[in-house]
């Protein structure tokens, strides 16, 4: 399975095409739109969220709510396009009024202009914008429809913002906590920490600054055998890390105990193996985060990402004007103060795509009934 998406932040719409999705999977459009709505929420979001009310429209590959095996096309309209059409029309538009010649530190502006030979960062920032992630969330939600058939569930939550970290103890089995976190303004399981996080966000907003943080995705009921040890590009942890690192603002990824393993002895890190006639092989710890040697081991997969503060600052940093090469304050585009909660939803979608793709590879079926038969043969002996 693979997908391509296209569209600009102020363009007419976002479009995604997914090829290789199995036939006969029932699709609930409300589930896709629910995840899109979650992406738009979160304390610290910008004013654009008051304009856009994202809804997915399926154009092909699904008939009477069931996938057909043909390429699936999804479209999400940009409501803000009516305000930008005269600057963004693909055929004829005003290219001078919205010109951006002072690149923002930390954004794709300058590298994109240098790579493609632009004297205007507008074409770069329009595509580099995190607006693109709306389509990735829709595609990830579609993948969750497949994962749910096999009992695989994904949960996202925020563990840190601006140096404020949750203190509440939890395990990956605390599903109710993660479900309740969806009602939180920050998708946070710790109410006390959430209040402190909001204060940090408010302070940053008042100062014209931005804040980052850490989000976590937990994947439950993932069967063993997804991914492979035989080649670098088939390792499940490598695929997950690449997908998550591709999300705007992500600067680090860790699985399981993550970077903490570098400060521990091997005897403190590796999960001992036990066997029971009823449940088979099992572990009492999950420091590996559900993956060993690039292969899922049957434990919950736990993955975290570090999100940098958004590079658009209302109190701009110093930069250089591409016209004249003189020092100038960086450009300001409408932006968020904190997008970590939204980032956790995008992260969940990215993980869902990788897991669904790995599951299709493992169960090798063009239709759901074949996948179910293979699943029973492999896992329900």
Swiss-Prot record:
The keyword Lyase applies. Keywords: Amino-acid biosynthesis, Aromatic amino acid biosynthesis, FAD, Flavoprotein, FMN, Lyase, NADP. Its cofactor is FMNH2. PROSITE patterns: CHORISMATE_SYNTHASE_2 (PS00788). It comes from the Bacteria. Homotetramer. This is Chorismate synthase. The gene is aroC.
